Curated annotation (Swiss-Prot):
Compositionally biased tracts (Low complexity): 417-433
The species this protein was found in: Homo sapiens (Human)
Molecular function in Gene Ontology: SUMO polymer binding; zinc ion binding
Protein name (Swiss-Prot/TrEMBL): Sine oculis-binding protein homolog
Motif stretch (SUMO interaction motif 1 (SIM)): 620-624
Family: Belongs to the SOBP family.
Modified residues (Phosphoserine): S629, S699
Encoding gene, per UniProt annotation: SOBP
Regions of compositional bias (Basic and acidic residues) in chain numbering: 1-14, 614-625
Length: 873
């Protein structure tokens, strides 16, 4: 064979890029014999008698007329014939194109009226018995051409070596290998069609004119695969089907392909007719009557209702082809079927069905139009299938899932106050199957598009429009209880109840649970859909104290009471450790201290919405009054009677009950860890005194009994104030109110964990130190601005640290009750009375750690504080 290729090379090749080989003009005897033997061997394989080469001089098949027109030279093989338009391969190879491949097979072909083996070229034609016997004719000199072609078999570009005349078309091949493979495929297909009993599909004259069959004797019975139409000499044919017609497949691969084809056809038949356009010609002849349409990009623009209303008669569908059909393939490609399945689960997009037109259509009705019958070969009673991400699902089950989804989260549908037709089931944007997939909006009223429907789920709303209480209720249901509003760092004050603020109200705004907001897992869409899910933003919240019924929100134990620092200050909801307010001096010190310690030192939440301030103030005052009304425990050293200086806050001063202290203790604990080291510094001593003030002892050192460790009166007061949140006003109030008598011993005056230990006479100082650690935490929160605001608040407090109130034991407790958030507002921090302090000490981390806890606790505490401070930095 290689010699033939060499012989066939034209002399022009010498000038071409490839080296030329000598060209022989005649086929030698050896080649003729080889061709004859090979041909006969092949014929024997397929059960034909052998053919003698001599018989091919002027072959006239007895079954065909001899006149030039009707005598079809079926396929004439020429080497290097002149280029002719070649038939695309798919029209020949695809099983669906059997009829098209042969439709023009023999029309008008025939090289000339004279026999093909004319003596002009002095060669004898060789019969190749594959399709019909083609005639091999050596290339004439004028026929020789060096033409670049794309091989009809391997689809590679190369020099044309062989061409096969297929009726009006000529197939060109780059090598003998491709040529032989193509001939073999055609021969098998022709033979299969002849023996398969498909003749009834084609008129008899069709055979006579187009595919003259070889008049050879068929020696054996052959089975033909019903899918690939190939003849396989195998006993392992797979039978499929039941009833009258049984199909035979040569392999499991063919069987599976057949099943997939049936499935695709079923899916198409169940699609609304309008969604699939007949871009592609009907599949063979048998698909013509089914009216099956394929999905195309243009079908997105068809209103779903129009598609359902149209009865797709074959005539209408045939004339409907929408848009250009670039692909000429007649098979159903998986992508087409995928598109078909997509239409069953469209996601809501701007354009949707006119709601007013389809009040009675269920949201996901994809029942096949009555006029579309299942394609041939499909069992008539099999339920239609819907493609989903999990594979084909029977349509009834799919519909049931959709209905369940619609029923399950009823609140998602919400009041369709923006929809034109409230009764329409299409107002639920979360359900699939409601609107057609994306496309240009049609001339529908704006009310029908999901964009204008109420956004019924917080996921769909852009988080840039947080719902404040004034917004219309239907727009955005409040987010789930665990998730804060999208853009608010803390719940707005207006949403907080004015009273004692029980936790349930704060934490539960009557919000629906999160579960129904999450789309059900059965929602399967073949393409990604972006569903914004609320991401919880961490908000520091003090550890809820079991003993207190007060809000475990971000508020410290003192959080119940908000004391407005300045009109602009917002309530300090989250500041636990810093319950004291600072006098102006203290504010300065506090600011410096705060600079020392990172603002995040304590667990307080510094970022509160400014709006809550006013609310917080009123709430705080009420709470403080409530707490302050009961007289302090006997150990307190006096009831909570403040001189007129602190009247408003006085009334509001909260009893420092054990519960409060427990909260403070937790809060302080966090803060203290960060600041324990600071105590050693001189400022630390001040802080301790401040802490003492909190306890009610700090001011005594300042005013009454300056402990050695406690700064002088003003200094001590200042220190105390500083330790507090760093808000001077609050601290000033605290100083005024808190006049811890030096005689008052702190509940456990035991030396504070800090290295500086206070003598029993300095119990105030020691307590101050312990408190101070707590205060340090609060100081961490203080910012420069906070100090300024504190000064303003101090003015509000209208008292000096030196005020007689400082000397009042009851006041001393309350002085610490005022807690300041850095910028938000003053929170009254309940200071336990001296007697209570002992009980409180365990509650307040600073006090238990410093006063109650032995010194041995100090090193671990300090280490812990250092670690926390570093982390905060």
């Amino acid at each position: 064979m290689a010699e033939m290729e060499k012989e066939g090379r034209p002399p022009e090749n010498k000038r071409s890029r490839k080296p030329a080989h000598p060209v022989k003009r005649e086929i030698n005897e050896e080649m003729k014999n080889f061709a004859e033997n090979t041909m006969n061997e092949l014929l024997g394989w397929y059960g034909y008698d052998k053919v003698e080469l001599k018989d091919g001089e002027d072959i006239e098949f007895r079954s065909y007329p001899t006149d030039g027109e009707s005598r079809q030279h079926i396929s004439v093989l020429k080497e290097n014939s002149l280029p002719k338009p070649k038939l695309p391969e798919d029209s020949v190879i695809s099983p669906y194109n059997i009829s098209t491949g042969y439709s023009g097979l023999a029309t008008g072909n025939g090289l000339s009226d004279s026999p093909a083996g004319s003596k002009d070229h002095g060669s004898v034609p060789i019969i190749v018995p594959l399709i019909p016997p083609p005639f091999i004719k050596p290339p004439a000199e004028d026929d020789v051409s060096n033409v670049q072609i794309m091989c009809a078999w391997c689809q590679k570009v190369g020099i044309k070596r062989y061409s096969l005349s297929m009726g009006s078309e000529v197939k060109s091949f780059c090598s003998e290998k491709c040529f032989a493979a193509c001939r073999r495929a055609y021969f098998k297909r022709n033979k299969a069609r002849d023996e398969d009993g498909h003749a009834e599909n084609f008129p008899q004259q069709h055979y006579a004119k187009e595919t003259p069959r070889l008049a050879f004797k068929n020696n054996c019975e052959l089975l033909v695969c019903d899918w690939c139409k190939h003849i396989r000499h195998t006993k392992e044919y797979l039978d499929f089907g039941d009833g009258e017609r049984r199909l035979q497949f040569c392999s499991a691969k063919c069987l599976n392909q057949y099943k997939m084809d049936i499935f695709y056809k079923e899916t198409q038949a169940n699609l609304p007719a309008g969604l699939c356009s007949t871009l592609h010609p009907p599949m063979e002849n048998k698909a013509e009557g089914t009216g099956v349409q394929l999905l195309t990009p243009d079908s997105w623009n068809i209103p779903l209702t129009d598609a359902r209303r149209k009865a797709p008669s074959p005539v209408a569908t045939a004339g409907q082809s929408q848009g250009p059909g670039p692909s000429a393939s007649t098979t159903v490609s998986p992508s087409d079927t995928a598109n078909c399945s997509v239409t069953k689960i469209p996601t809501p997009v701007p354009k949707s069905i006119p709601i007013s037109e389809t009040p009675n259509i269920p949201p996901v009705s994809v029942q096949p139009p009555a006029s579309i019958g299942p394609p041939l070969g499909v069992p008539p009673r099999s339920p239609p299938m819907v493609m989903t991400n999990r594979g084909p699902v029977p349509l009834p089950i799919f519909m049931e899932q959709q209905i369940m989804q619609q029923i399950r989260p009823p609140f998602i549908r919400g009041p369709p106050h923006h929809a034109s037709n409230p009764n329409s089931p299409l107002s639920n944007p979360m359900l699939p199957g409601i609107g057609p997939p994306p496309g240009g909006p049609r001339n529908l009223g704006p009310t029908s598009s999901p964009m204008h429907r109420p956004m019924l789920s917080p996921h769909i709303h852009p988080p840039s429009t947080p719902t404040m209480p004034g917004n219309p209720p239907g727009l955005l249901p409040p987010p789930p209880p665990g998730a804060p509003l999208p853009s608010l760092p803390f719940p707005p004050v207006s949403m907080m109840p004015n009273g004692p603020m029980p936790v349930p109200q704060m934490m539960n705004f009557g919000l629906p649970s999160l579960a129904p907001l999450v789309p059900p897992p059965t929602l399967l869409v073949p393409y990604p859909v972006i569903v914004p899910l609320p991401v919880p933003i961490p908000i520091p919240i003090p550890i809820p104290h079991v003993s207190d019924s007060k809000p475990p929100n971000g508020f410290s134990s003192n959080g119940e009471n908000f004391i407005p620092n300045a009109p602009g200050d917002s309530a300090a909801a989250g500041g636990k450790p810093s319950g004291h307010s600072l006098s102006p001096r203290d504010s300065k010190q506090g600011s410096s201290k705060s600079a020392d310690s990172p603002p995040g030192c304590s667990g307080q939440a510094l970022s509160l919405a400014p709006t809550p301030a006013e609310h917080g103030r009123s709430e705080v005052v009420d709470l403080t009054r409530r707490a302050g009304s009961p007289p302090g425990p006997p150990g307190a050293g006096g009831q909570l009677g403040f001189p007129g200086v602190l009247q408003g806050p006085q009334d509001g001063v909260i009893d420092l009950t054990v519960g409060h202290r427990a909260r403070l203790h937790n809060v302080i604990h966090r803060a203290l860890h960060a600041h324990v080291k600071a105590e050693r510094e001189p400022s630390a001593a001040e802080r301790r005194t401040c802490g003492g003030c909190r306890d009610g002892h700090c001011s005594p050192p300042a005013a009454g009994d300056p402990g050695p460790g406690a700064p002088a009166g003003p200094e001590a007061a200042a220190a105390c104030n500083v330790i507090v949140n760093g808000t001077r006003g609050a601290a000033a109030e605290g100083a005024k109110s808190a006049e811890p008598p030096p005689e008052q011993p702190p509940p456990p005056p035991p030396p504070a964990p800090p290295k500086k230990l206070l003598s029993p006479e300095e119990p105030a100082v020691s307590e101050l130190e312990s408190v101070k650690e707590n205060n340090c935490a609060s100081n961490c929160h203080l910012d420069g601005e906070a100090a300024k605001k504190l000064m303003g608040e101090e003015a509000l407090a209208g008292g000096d640290k030196s005020d007689p109130n400082l000397n009042n034991p009851a006041d001393e407790d309350h002085a610490y009750a005022l807690r300041m958030l850095p910028k938000t507002g003053c929170v009254i921090q309940p200071v336990p009375k001296p007697a209570e302090k002992a009980a409180m000490a365990p509650c307040i981390i600073s006090s238990p750690m410093l006063s109650a806890g032995p010194e041995d606790l100090e090193p671990p505490l300090k280490r812990r504080c250092l670690r926390i401070r570093n982390q905060n930095k």
